[in-house]
Every structure is written in structure tokens, then in C-alpha cells.
Amino acid sequence: MVLLYDFVLEEDEFCRLANVSHEEFLIWKDMGVVEPVITEGEIRFPAEALAKLVKAKKIQHDFELDFSGTSLVLDLLEEIALLRQKLKRYEND
């Protein structure tokens, strides 16, 4: 799958590409995994949100987690990535 990071999708197209039902999409959205962007009064979803949801679904499937467990894992992975970036900056100084 090729993603363009300035690409935005409407909700129906987002669900189709992520292969999720509308109900499942709303759960991910409520959990903060999928965050919309409002442009010109329209709600859209950026491509990076699609990549994040695909990653979330893989984690959920691989580790047999529920939605909140998956959301927690994603948050922790993001925190680890930030800490690694900070560590790399300190190591380069």
C-alpha cells in the first residue's frame, strides 16, 4: 500500500481502505487512534491516520488485545519512539 502523507480521506473511503466497519471505525476514533482533521468545514482523515489504524489492527490481531489494550500499546510505542529520538540527540552532543 502506498500512502501519501498529505492525502486526506472522507470517512467512508477511510473505512474501506482500512477494511473496518463504520462501528469499528467509531470505536478507534473514540479511543483516539484515528484523529480527524477539519478543513474548510469538512471532516477528513489524513493518510498517517490510516497507517496508524492498520498498525493498530495488526497489533490487536497479533496479541489478541481489545481496543483499549491496543490503544495503550500504540501510546507506549509512540512514547518509546520519542524517548529514542531524545536519546539520539543526547548521544550526538
Residue ranges and their predicted role:
Residues V2-D12, R16, D30-E35, T39-D93:
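Arg/Lys-rich, alpha-helical DNA-contact motif
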